[in-house]
Amino acid sequence: MNLLLGNLMYIFNKYLFIIFIYFFNLNIIYADPVVDKDWLKNKICKDNIKILEVHRSKKDYEIAHIPCSIYTNFYSDGWRETKDSIPLLMPSVSNLEKLIGSFGISSSDYVIIVAPGLGKYDAAEAAAIYFTFKYLGHKNISLLDGGFKSWKEDWDNDTETGFILPQKKIYRSKVNKNLLANKDDVLKVINKSGYLIDARSSAMYMGINYLFPALRAGTIPNAVNIPNEWMLKNNTLFFQERENLEKIFEYSGISKKEGQISFCNAGLESALSWFVMSEILEFPNNKLYESSLAEWSKDMSLPMIDIINFSNNSKKSVGKDKESFSMKPEE
């Protein structure tokens, strides 16, 4: 009798464990694109979960980081490069595979991207890395709401110091080219249907100010201005609630029924716009014009409008701005 009872208990515990693993993996697969620090607490230092921390410097990471996280820098590690004078373009697929593999990440891992959490540029960099993973066909990926700042400010959360070089893995991608738009796609939207989303500030959209690598002031005809700061709460890395984001796009006249293309000066800020529409609001046909105005504005055959007629776009030149341009935003 005791033997029978023992066998039954063994079978029960075995299947209970299988059910637990099933629902644990289900939770990972269907996790939201934005997760909070409480969700992350129970996920740190797990074999199939990789926390990728984006920092301004290795020194910042060494001072304090989430346990078992992996350090990266958006600029120095090579997440983007310049091609034909167009900055902030994704490198070749093979180079991206090598880069991600060097972090010890495989295509089956769940990746949580953690930015410093200090403002919209942090959010844009994190969203650009997220977009890169999605472009490579990665399935399981999220951003940490509030970034590392929100994690560190919770005294119940542990942090580590120092740096450990991750063990390299082979990363294999399944590229999804449908996420990228080119200038021909943009022209089709101008002349037919769909929406162009200008993610820059209203001053740049209207042509009051402009910044290299955009070579002309103003915006693309028929573009709708939805600045990045609208996506975030008070210049932090905390996203607005979904219902409020829906109101923003509804107010701006953007519908899910037709496709959308996001752009900015060089594809960085618009990565955040893409993330909100594609991942949070689940717009089914949203693309990123990665080359953005860096490509568009230098081709004088392509139209731009100066909404308040602040300048003559056909003659205006960037002058000194070109010399002072840096891929890294000012701190």
Where are the regions that the model predicts?
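Active-site neighborhoods of enzymes that stabilize oxyanions during catalysis
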Residues: 36, 80, 148-221, 301-331
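C-terminal soluble interaction/assembly domains
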Residues: 247, 257-309
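Short, structured coil segments at secondary-structure junctions
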Residues: 65-67, 137, 219, 282, ...
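Short active-site oxyanion
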Residues: 46-50, 139-140, 259-260, 284
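Classical Sec-dependent N-terminal signal peptides that target proteins to the secretory pathway
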Residues: 3-31
